[in-house]
Curated annotation (Swiss-Prot):
The keyword rRNA-binding applies. This is Large ribosomal subunit protein uL11. Part of the ribosomal stalk of the 50S ribosomal subunit. Interacts with L10 and the large rRNA to form the base of the stalk. L10 forms an elongated spine to which L12 dimers bind in a sequential fashion forming a multimeric L10(L12)X complex. GO terms for biological process: translation.
Length: 143
């Protein structure tokens, strides 16, 4: 068995799918840890080519020998909710100003997409998490 590499950093970023480039914020975040930025950009863009237009969070593990691995996460719940509700952004005051609405079926669909990244045991618990996010954005959930 090969010896384990020592981890020197864990970097979490949210990047547009297929549009990673060395410009800020990506360049400085990776460059400060000695990672080859273009290698990461090419690998990330290749893996996210089919998800164009979405923001895909990525968790980059940088090792002491300056090599790296990365794990793609599911798109943020807020982004999925905005897309489902057809709104540009959430509200500043969710108590008084509602910006859109989604159905329970749409919430279930989003929860199924997000399930691997949520800390929920089952789909109903995942739906409650997504409904809470919708409420805080000023999006109402209808039956």
């Amino acid at each position: 068995m090969a010896p384990k590499k020592k981890v020197s950093a864990l970097i979490k970023l949210q990047i547009q799918a297929g549009k990673a480039n060395p410009a800020p914020p990506l360049g400085p975040a990776l460059g400060s840890h000695g990672v080859n930025i273009m290698d990461f950009c090419k690998a990330y863009n290749a893996q996210t080519q089919d998800k164009m237009g979405q923001v895909i969070p990525v968790e980059i593990t940088v090792y002491e020998d300056r090599s790296f691995t990365f794990v793609l996460k599911t798109p943020p719940a807020a982004a999925l909710l905005k897309k489902a509700a057809g709104v540009e952004k959430g509200t500043e005051n969710p108590l008084t100003h509602k910006v859109g609405s989604v159905t329970k079926a749409q919430v279930r669909e989003i929860a199924e997409i997000k399930m691997e990244d949520l800390s929920a045991r089952d789909i109903e618990a995942g739906m409650k998490i997504i409904e809470g996010t919708a409420r805080s954005m000023g999006i109402t959930v209808t039956d």
